[in-house]
Structures are given as structure tokens and as C-alpha cells.
């Protein structure tokens, strides 16, 4: 067995222990493999290495290819079995463990001790060593040993890799011996220092390469590069050398080691331009004179010194025949230029070391992937601890994505119907919806990724047609490169998009970053889906809590109640009041006990009961249940709901709505009017959010907190036994009715009205088109709002007296806000509110524009607008009077006493039972 000189072995013993090896056993094993130069030495080294790193090793057989392409073991001489588990491992080219080999698999006595079954704590490992360059199994090792731990598994992988490298080295030396021996015998060169034991002479360069190869046992690519570069510097007399590694996509060069120094951060630069890129394509060496100025600038920046001479030689993989690195030597000592001999030295070096280099780099890449997988598992742990809050989860996703990819900025968009919405940024979570970023789901880079579901890696953002640089121009930020990837749920549907901007330690995001982003996106999708599911579960609990709260507050409708209501049948509308269908009628004049019958009368007069075959007892129970569903705040009570419903009836009777809307739409509008303020607590949306109420927890993320609660309560009543008036509807009609009710009730939020006001104006200008579905939706919203504010269309006495009720409600909320330590709005503060000015402002900016639109669409509604304008004049006179005399006292409601009443300009005298519709939700 031939080994390297003792001096070399002493050098090896000083090398640091590879990370993860635990002790010197693995290092000694790799040293043994790194120093062999013949077959006998290889077999002995393999046996010693496996015995050192594996438990309870009893037998090791190493099978190598002979001249007839058979796998043969020399000690004792026998051929590898061709059947059973051995054949299975060779065909699959993967290591296989078993509890012994079958008797029919074993050719004679040498392998008899491996026959199954073995002792329970032992096994036979069949280890095929695959030469990827040749595409075939180069050797097979049979080992009888104990069961492996994780550390022993790791050590075995290292031994396998270095055994294959040692085998290739031995084979290369054998080929060289066969070609060099005759020539060396006849004409021994002067520099040859022959080892005549085998009849072969080696040059000094051969011996140096052999010594270098023996030293290349490192599992760390940087340590390996240091040894190779030191050898090149010595042999070429270069002041420093480096190895520029080519990325898998041939678009990027990276350097980690320069001369005798390992850089703290890897340096990367693009390979798309300049002569260095040509070297990768042409596989031909170049010198300094061939470089472009851009190449020179990049190299000098990397080296930190002036380049006076350079030799760049491509390193070609024998497995793929592709350039995997560029070996560069700089500034030859003595100021000379590099020669052809220097180029030959570099090529000769990598002829023997390129396989070790590429395999070590591949091994290190696997280790890096292992570390990244561990990092991803930690990321998953971090993400799954924030499932209770989607916003916090998205913030965590942004942080982890930025850290994993070394990106400067990260943004996450969630897909919301046809829009991509971002409300979580690097700086934190945006609470105000007005500051959210919303972009169409089919526009821009994020939109493209959301639409295609494919990752998009953009090296140069400004050169990409989908990039909009207006934001950069306005902010001064410079977007260099972008990596945008989709986030999908378990059904592979895109639910969001993540966008990474500006790679920090590289020219752009690499293929490795793409793979990492793809893996990361899986965790994102799972965590977001589970977070949304968690949110739904919480919402279900909140709904359950609210339902229980409502059932405790309200009593169910008894059979006696609806039987009494229907005892004499449904009363005709004309029997209620001769002016019941007139805009001048004040519904609050009707006693509250008679309002349920009035609802039934209006439904019958509009023919909905007959058209939709509604069961009268069910309808009676529904009406009584809705009435009980209202609490008793000063304004948002059942009488308000009845007044709103009555105004809907007036619109139907006076404006001929059947020429504009479908019957189902009108029916949905009327029922929505009845239910639009169910379970109102006398406080608005802002108060719910500020007080962190159960309602806010349930609905604040969607907006319109109270309106969504009103609709939910309406559904709860419909789902109550004996109250579903839509029970006979088809599935399609039932779904449409609920959709209409939801949209109409949500339209009672004045914020919604203000959002669609321009669309309403445009519709009034161009004229209503019954064939236009959007016009139907807009008109329903306008009609609902006009019904909700209908108290403003009644006489001055009604409007004046009603203001007392609504401001009592407002001031009660203001008192609660003060008790919470908050500052209420002026209109809610009994000590600051100047009611005449507040009413004038409300009528000018909200009420009058609404009824003006109604007049434009329905000329018969002109009297409504005129009456609202008249009431506005009354408030102006009241305001002027108090400007002269001052407020009567500190109580802002005192001015409503009869002493300060202004005579009714239109002479209308209406019974007082209600309030103005300043709905501040």
C-alpha cells in the first residue's frame, strides 16, 4: 500500500476538524482516503474509514470494475452477487440496508457470514458509488455493521463522497502510468525523481499535484479553494489568485476566496456583459489585454488593487462539459506577463482537482440547503405562532422573507376578489383603510404573478415592461431588481403575492433564491389559510355569543301574540288613515301597538303576500320578531324602522317603482327597511371600534360594523323557527334575496353613500337604464338612504321634535366616550354641540343632495326636496335667533323648548312621535 510521505501526513493532521464530525475519527478516515494512490491502498483505506465512522463493523468488501467491466473484490477474490438486494441497489443506484442477504444471492463461502437473518441490531449496507460523469456505477461496497445514528449517517455520506474521489484519482494515475511508463523508461527526464518500485517515473509537477490531491479532503469549499489557490500562486508566481464560480444559470459570477483570504461576504456580479462572459461560452483563456473596461473595474473593485497582469482560465466540469468556474491569476511577480506554461499549469491542476472541487461545492450546497431547510422549519414555527391575527402574521412573513433572501424591502398582497390588497408593510400595519394599497389583480408585476401563478425574477426592474417607475421617481428610491412569487392555498389557488425588492449581497436574486421563495411560499400559504380559518372560528364564536345575548334580551314571539294580530285578518290600508299613502302623512302619529298590523297592511297592498305565497302566520311571527329585535334607544328604535318602512311604501305608491325595479328588488327593499337597524345599541361604528366591543371584533376588518350586525340579526330572525318568510323561495331566489338585503342594509352606512355619490350623479345625468344592472344596484342604495333620512321630509314640528331624540342618543354616546377617557366629536358632546349649525350642515351636505338626486330621477319626488329645503330654512332662522339671544343655558337641548319655537312656515301641523334622521353611523 503506497501512501503520501510522512511529512505530508503531518501537515494533514494539523487541518481543522470538519464541522459536524464530532471528533477526529472522520478526519482520520478522510485523511486515509486522501492519501492513497493505488487499488490496494484504496481498499484498505475504505475498510479503515468505515470501521472508524460506523458502529460494530465486522466485514467490509470493496468491489471495483475490472477489465471486463465486472465488479470484483480482490480480498478474498470473488465477484459481486448479481441477484437480490445487491442487484436492486445497483439498479436503483441508491444505498440499501437490509437484515442480511438471501442464500441464493451469495456465490460461495466469502459472503456466508452475510446471510439473513442477522442479529437484530446489525445490518448489511449495499453502497453503490455512482460516477456521474460516466453515468455508471464505479464501485460497490458491502458493509456488515450496526444501526446508524444521524451523526454516523452524516459521516458515511462524507466517506462515500471521498471514496469516489479517491477512486477517480487512482484510476487517473493508473491511466497515466500506462502511458508514461514506456517513455519514462527509455528517456527519463532530468527533473524526474523516479519511484522505481512500480517501474514508473513521476515529474516534480506530478508529485506536487499528487500531494495537492492528497490534501483536498476538506468538506468546506473555502478551505479547499485556499489550498488550490496557494498551489496556483506558487506555481505561476502570481501575487494572488481567485476562483470565480459560475452560477447554474450562467448569469452570475461569485467569489468567496481571494489568495489566502476567505471573504466575510461573498462577492457577486453579473456575467451578462464583458469578456468574462465570453470565456464561459467559448471555453478559451484570456489575458488582461482582452478585458473590457467594465471587466477591469469589477475585478479591481473585488481585489482592492490595480491589475497589471492577468490570466483567466476556464474550469470545465468533466461531468457536464460546462464551465463551472474561472481560475484567475493576477500580477505575476517580477512584473512579467503570464505565459502559456502558466496556462498549462492551471489546466493541469484542474484536470485532477476539478472533480473534487465540484463535488465539494455540491456537498456544500447540500449542506446549505440543509441549513435553509432548518431555517424554514424555524420560520414555520414562527409563522404558526401568529395564526390568531392575520396582520401580525403578514408582518412576520415580511420579516422572515426579507431575512431569508437578503432583500432590502418586502411587500405582501392578499387577493381580495379582483384586487390585490396590501395593508401590512415593513414599517408596520396600516389601521386606516384609506392608507391601504389596492391594485387591480391583473396589472403590474404583482398582478402578473397573481394571474399566472408563476414566480417572476426580474434582474433589471427598469428594463421590465411591467414595472412602473413613477413611485421611484416621486420617492427617490431606486428599485434595482425584484423577485415576486405567488402564495397558494392547499388547492393551488393563488391567495396572495409576495414581492422582494433589491438583493443586498448580490446583483440580483439567484436561482437559489427562487427555490427558497418557492419553499417559503408553501409555509406562507398554509399559515395564511389556517389564520383565516382561525378567524372564521373566532367569528363563529362571536356570533354565537351575540345570538345568546340577543335571545337573552328579547323574548320569543308567543302563539298568542301572532294569533291576536291575525284574529280579524289583515286591515286594509285605507282603514288606517285616509292619507296613509301620501308623502304628507307622518307615520310616527300611529300608535306603536298598531304598527305591526300596518306593516302587514302595506305588504298586502303592494301584493307581495300573494305574489310570493307568503304564509300569513309566518309573516306575522316575522314582523313581531323584528319589532322585538329593536332595543329602546331614543332614536334608533322600532318606530324609526317603521317610519323608514312606511317611506319605502310611499315611494312604491307615488313614484311607480315597478317601472324601474323588479318586484323582488322592491320586496327586498321593504324588508331591508324593516331590518336595517336591528339590535342598534344607540352608538355608532366609531364607538364600537374605540370600545373594542364584540361587534368590532367580529366586523371591524370588513368595515360598516353596525350595518353588518343589523344584517346578521335579520338572518338570525329568518333562521328562527316559524319566521322564515322566504321559505318557499327557490334556492336561486333565496340566495338573491339575501344578497339584495345585504347590499341594501350595508348602503345605510353614510360612508358607503358618499363613496357612490359620484356614480349616482352620473346615473342621474345620463338617465336611468333599466337594462343596466349597476343602475339597479345604485338606485336601490339611493332609495334606501332616502328612506333612512325620510324624517327630514316631514313638517317642521316633526323635524324639530325629532332632533331632541337623536341628540339625546348622541349625547349619551358622548358621555360614554368621556367616561372611557376619549374626546367625543362635537356633535356628540352636550357641552359643545351647537345643534342648529350641525343640522344645517347635515341638511346641506347630506340630505338635500340625496333628495335632489331623487327629484332628478323621479319628478314626482319634487315635493320631498322642497320640504327638506323648507326645514333647512327653519334651522337657519333658529340659528340666527340664538346668535342674537345666545343659548338659554348650558344644556344644548334647552333651545327646543316651546318658548323658542319658530312658526311652521308651511302651516303643516303633524302629531309628534319621532325624530329627524341624522343617522351618524
UniProtKB/Swiss-Prot annotation:
InterPro entries, alphabetized: GAF, GAF-like_dom_sf, HD/PDEase_dom, PDEase, PDEase_catalytic_dom, PDEase_catalytic_dom_sf, PDEase_CS
Chain intervals with Polar residues compositional bias: 177-188
Domain of life, source organism: Eukaryota
Cofactor (UniProt): Zn(2+); Mg(2+)
Key words of the record: Acetylation, cAMP, Cell membrane, cGMP, cGMP-binding, Cytoplasm, Hydrolase, Magnesium, Membrane, Metal-binding, Mitochondrion, Mitochondrion inner membrane, Mitochondrion outer membrane, Nucleotide-binding, Repeat, Zinc
Enzyme Commission no: 3.1.4.17
Activity-regulation annotation: The 3',5'-cyclic-AMP phosphodiesterase activity is stimulated by 3',5'-cyclic GMP.
Domain GAF: 220-357, 389-528
Primary role: cGMP-activated cyclic nucleotide phosphodiesterase with a dual-specificity for the second messengers cAMP and cGMP, which are key regulators of many important physiological processes. Has a higher efficiency with cGMP compared to cAMP. Plays a role in cell growth and migration.
Domain writeup: The GAF 1 domain functions as a dimerization domain.
Record's protein name: cGMP-dependent 3',5'-cyclic phosphodiesterase
Organism: Bos taurus (Bovine)
